Amino acid sequence: MKQEETTPEQRPPARLPLWANPRIGLVVLLIALIALFTTLRPAFLNTQLTLVPMQADISVYAVVGLSQLAVLSLGHMNMAVGRMAAMSAFASGLLHDRLDAPLLVALAGGLAVGALLGALAGLVISRTGVNSFVVTLALDFALIGLVSLLYATFTDGVAFNGLPAGMSALRTDTFADYCAGDVCGPEIPLLAPIALIAVLGVGLLFRWSRVGREVLMTGANAKAAELSGIPVRWRVVQAHALSGLLAGLAGFLLSANNGSFSAGVGDGFLLPSFLAPVLGGTLLVGGAVSVLGTVLGTAITQVIYKGLNLLQFQVDELKLYIGLVLLAALSLDRLRHVLAERRGVPA
């Protein structure tokens, strides 16, 4: 009996081995860093000193990373992510200070301002064809002056004094503070579920929704997407609006974590906004994103920062070593991709 031959076209594609899976690599790196810092400083696992504050920071900066991820999906950049957060925080603070708005109304107002700023940037980019880097950088400079002017006009200094009812609890409380009889919740800050909702929402958007898929197709090849009937300009506006909305949410979370709506909200957002998604596997050229990878990238960044801080590194040293460690991580990730390609498996 003649034996059937299997041609290359008939063979199933090579499966990605565990060692070449980028998410597995990030999890292994995260576990290794936690083990290292715990060995060097056992206080790293102290709940109140390290774990709860670190969870709050991860919650804030995961949303910051998602804000940048929204436009990286197009191959664009949002250089104004920090200033959009500051403007959103100002709007929330103003609504409470002048109109005595409750927490949810103040939050909604801030998110609306962030989304409008993002949509404005997206509209300019889609209509003029000017590079997103240039447009959002110009917007960033404009908002720097506007934020300072607005805070100087509407506050006594650089921050609103009061907070909406319930916002202080977001800063100080964990689920362990709420009990049903003798059963109390875990030591997880109240900020975490808000960030989790954002993570799930963005993940579902890009995974299952038509809009998310069309944004990714636009990022992969805008001309081909337009020829296939996708409203490319509208998708650009929507992606930038989402970026602004998430920046606004991050500004609100940081304000809650800091205990005030201040002009300095968002000052340190730009670098982390790129580090988390890129470390997590999101492509700078567009067309592919990783929401889970962004969360893992954020966790790795914050673990490094907290660990080095416990080891009493100075601020400049912290920046240096965080940069070196992340550069090494990105280089190893690239090496893994090259090795995977040589073995004939998709990276």
Regions found by a protein language model. Give the residues of each.
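Structural signal for alpha-helical transmembrane segments and their membrane-water exit/capping regions
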Residues: A32-N46, L74, L150-Y151, V202-R210, ...
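Inter-helical junctions in multi-pass inner-membrane proteins, predominant
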Residues: P42-P53, A152-T155, F206-G212, H240-P277, ...
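Transmembrane alpha-helical segments in multi-pass inner-membrane proteins
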Residues: A247, N257-I322
